[in-house]
């Protein structure tokens, strides 16, 4: 224990730490950390080749921790006295060869950090081919087949990639995630109740997919090859590489993938006139994608850091739909009509996201000023051909084609200042400006016996701009076992939309809203060695109508189904209240209420023989949720965690102009198990089940899935062979029922989810030596 001399209470002193190895050589890139003596939680950390300097409170007990490659982790009690001091540490060298890793560590799979849950995505990536599948296996995240991801409520969450919001439709976002390689993800951060620092338009919470970047350990990387086979197959090949010098860190990743998949959709729709519409549609998807990600990170000096990163995803999309429809009388059973609709869509899409980040350290207390400027570009160009063959009664075949062009440009600037005072106040203040421009141009033609003509019903040109200016302030202070963090966010919204074709129509939304936030933490007790901490959260948020939900043009699905936006859609507001308990940074239990007003969602309206899928405001929903997490801390060979969540929904409002109430309780179960029979073999089993699920008022019958993964290290742990089986029992199928005013239907929807796959991963260069950690953690293979 290091004893320093007493000076006077309530002041800070400077502590300098120098470290060398047992050969008296300077340790390269040593990470020096200051931990709390009471619970070993992290206070400060620095990685440097030189002397590290900390400003610490005098007459206080801490823990000093130092880690580095090929160095045994160093721990020592530290008690600050009254005078500045310098600590010289000799670290013990551990003999290793380049490219080898001794796996004697435990990497946390699931842990709580303040107001966010952090999931180690690398544990899930081994049994996944893309980011979408990783999200499906993420504990507490509920993914529907349209690509929406849910956390606490019936409102979809907002998706971020490396801290940048992805402003795409659910379908475009799902396509982007399905083309993002699973092995490019480092971790997933789940913010169920984001603070005032984050955009208020995140009523459903935030999921931040953090991509891998280079680490300061010289040259290292991996090469990956995989093939998955179900009814259809998919394959991918790619690499990740990073290179670091003393101040410069660069990284690059590339992935090529080709995916084939199929979807079965069967539905029965019952009309008010006693008719039955039976529909069976099969869709075959064939997509190829090239993904490139890279970045550069430069330490100008000890205080200033500049970084640039870019992500490019280029996809060739192809789909073929074969839709069989029959119309009959429920009373007599007579066939009234029968036809086949064939639709082909093909075309490229391009996503480019890039940004510059500048971070400046203001002092040694941890204060900093960060600025980011991001530009996102998305373009899709789809050509569609369709034909409607009327079998009974026999009529002329209807032929048509169209071109759908979408362009999005998003520019965002954000500035954040974090001030940490000597009296242990943390003050955060910042601003964000976002400009978004979206353009849609759809041109359709109908082929008739007399020629080819413009289809004025489907042809559309639409322009949409969105300007959002925001500023926030929040303050955090810990005293007497309590941490209190109140905050407030002010946002100004200016939205304009103009349809030029088929008719010149405009709409505009201008509004200013205030969003308060309160976070209170209190240490409850210590039971069986676990420190229990309770949190209370209050938050107000908004869900704004987005471009696709407002665009009034009719998009053709088949001759009986159209997708159409609603330019009269109004924002939805959510007030959230939550109490939760954590045990040693592990989430244990949560209970909360989402009070949602002016709710809007996807709805299906029936107009005679035609269905319109649109968006509309319904009324209110008071949703109660409860979530519990249990697990066995990892021993030498076995670990598991289980998550149970219950949602109780109470809707009240109008559906298609008819008053309605809707009450439903749904349950979700997750289970992850990991078994390590040898030092080089890890087996994992991931399963989930959902009961009484409701999505956009479609009530789903119980469904779920079981996935297995085996990970074997070979070639002195330089290569991993991963065998995966997804949806073993083929139970991940949605059977649905909807019974609402003017719309009654049932059916099922099924993807080619059951797949067996093999992946090879070769690791090269210098890898970080993992550390031994405590709590709810899982053994990790080399990655």
Locate the predicted segments by residue.
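Short, acidic, small-residue-rich periplasmic hinge/interaction motif at the N-terminus
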Residues: 23, 31-35, 65-71, 86-125, ...
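Short acidic/polar hinge/loop motifs at secondary-structure boundaries
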Residues: 55, 131, 137, 164-192
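N-terminal periplasmic accessory domains that precede
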Residues: 84-90, 131-134, 173-176, 190, ...
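Surface-exposed extracellular loop regions of Gram-negative outer-membrane beta-barrel proteins
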Residues: 210-223, 261-269, 278-279, 287-295, 494-496, 527-576, 591-609, 728-741, ...
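Outer membrane beta-barrel strand-and-loop segments of large Gram-negative receptors
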Residues: 280, 410-414, 455-460, 570, ...
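Face-selective signature of the C-terminal outer-membrane beta-barrel domain
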Residues: 291-315, 343-498, 525-531, 586-591, ...
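Outer-membrane beta-barrel signature, preferentially recognizing the C-terminal barrel domain
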Residues: 406, 460-466, 542-595, 613-624, ...
């Amino acid at each position: 224990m290091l004893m320093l001399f007493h000076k006077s209470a309530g002041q800070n002193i400077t502590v300098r730490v120098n470290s060398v190895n047992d050969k008296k050589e300077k340790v390269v890139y040593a990470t020096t950390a200051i931990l709390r003596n009471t619970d070993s939680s992290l206070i400060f950390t620095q990685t440097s080749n030189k002397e590290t300097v900390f400003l610490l409170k005098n007459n206080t007990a801490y823990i000093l921790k130092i880690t580095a490659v090929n160095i045994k982790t160093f721990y020592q009690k530290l008690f600050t006295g009254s005078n500045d001091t310098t600590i010289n540490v000799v670290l013990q060298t551990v003999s290793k060869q380049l490219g080898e890793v001794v796996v004697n560590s435990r990497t946390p799979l699931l842990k709580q950090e303040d107001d966010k849950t952090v999931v180690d995505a690398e544990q899930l990536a081994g049994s996944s081919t893309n980011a979408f599948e990783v999200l499906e296996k993420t504990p507490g995240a509920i993914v529907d087949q349209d690509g929406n991801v849910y956390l606490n409520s019936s409102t979809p969450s907002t998706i971020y990639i490396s801290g940048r919001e992805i402003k795409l439709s659910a379908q475009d976002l799902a396509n982007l995630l399905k083309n993002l390689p699973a092995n490019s993800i480092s971790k997933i951060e789940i913010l169920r109740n984001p603070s005032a620092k984050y955009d208020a338009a995140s009523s459903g919470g935030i999921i931040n997919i953090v991509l891998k970047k280079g680490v300061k350990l010289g040259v290292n990387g991996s090469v990956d090859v995989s093939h998955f086979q179900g009814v259809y197959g998919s394959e991918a090949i790619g690499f990740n590489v990073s290179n670091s010098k003393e101040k410069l860190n660069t990284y690059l990743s590339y992935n090529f993938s080709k995916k084939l998949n199929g979807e079965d959709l069967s539905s029965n729709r019952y009309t008010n006139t006693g008719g039955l519409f039976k529909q069976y549609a099969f869709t075959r998807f064939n997509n190829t994608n090239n993904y490139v990600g890279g970045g550069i990170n430069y330490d100008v000096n000890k205080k200033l850091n500049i970084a640039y990163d870019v992500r490019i995803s280029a996809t060739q999309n192809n789909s073929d739909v074969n839709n069989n429809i029959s119309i009959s009388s429920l009373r007599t059973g007579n066939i009234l009509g029968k036809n086949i609709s064939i639709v082909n869509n093909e075309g490229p899409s391009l996503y480019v996201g890039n940004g510059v980040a500048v971070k400046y350290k203001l002092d040694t207390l941890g204060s900093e000023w960060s600025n980011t400027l991001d530009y996102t570009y998305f373009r899709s160009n789809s050509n569609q051909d369709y034909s409607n063959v009327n079998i009974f009664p026999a009529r002329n075949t209807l032929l048509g084609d169209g071109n759908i062009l979408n362009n999005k440009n998003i520019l965002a600037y954000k500035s954040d200042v974090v001030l940490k005072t000597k009296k242990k106040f943390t003050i955060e203040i910042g601003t964000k400006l976002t400009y978004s421009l979206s353009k849609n141009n759809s041109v359709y033609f109908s082929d008739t016996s007399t020629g080819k003509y413009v289809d004025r019903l489907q042809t559309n040109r639409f322009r949409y701009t969105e300007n959002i200016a925001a500023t926030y302030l929040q303050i955090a202070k810990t005293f007497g076992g309590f941490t209190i963090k109140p905050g407030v966010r002010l946002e100004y919204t200016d939205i304009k939309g103009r349809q030029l074709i088929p008719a010149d129509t405009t709409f505009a939304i201008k509004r200013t809203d205030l969003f308060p936030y309160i976070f209170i933490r209190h240490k409850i007790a210590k039971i069986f060695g676990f420190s229990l901490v309770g949190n209370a959260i209050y938050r107000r948020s908004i869900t704004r109508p987005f471009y696709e939900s407002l665009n009034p043009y009719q998009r053709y699905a088949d001759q009986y189904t159209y997708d159409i936006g609603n330019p009269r859609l109004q924002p939805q507001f959510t007030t959230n209240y939550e109490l939760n308990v954590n045990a040693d940074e592990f989430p244990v239990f949560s209970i909360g209420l989402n009070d949602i007003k002016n709710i809007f969602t996807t709805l299906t309206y029936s107009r005679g023989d035609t269905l319109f899928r649109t968006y509309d405001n319904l009324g209110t929903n008071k949703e109660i949720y409860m979530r519990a997490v249990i697990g066995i801390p990892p021993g030498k060979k076995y670990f598991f965690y289980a998550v149970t969540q219950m949602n109780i929904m109470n809707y009240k409002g109008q559906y298609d102009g008819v008053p309605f109430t809707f009450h439903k309780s749904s349950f979700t179960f997750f289970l992850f198990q990991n078994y390590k029979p040898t030092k080089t073999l890890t087996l994992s089993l991931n399963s989930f089940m959902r009961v009484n699920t409701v999505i956009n008022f479609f009530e789903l019958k119980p469904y779920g899935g079981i996935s297995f993964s085996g990970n074997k290290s070979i070639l002195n742990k330089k290569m991993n062979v991963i065998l995966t089986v997804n949806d073993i029992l083929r139970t991940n199928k949605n059977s649905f029922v909807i019974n609402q005013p003017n719309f009654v239907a049932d059916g099922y929807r099924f993807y080619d989810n059951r797949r067996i796959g093999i992946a090879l991963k070769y690791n090269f260069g210098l890898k970080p030596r993992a550390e031994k950690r405590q709590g709810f953690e899982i053994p990790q293979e080399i990655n």
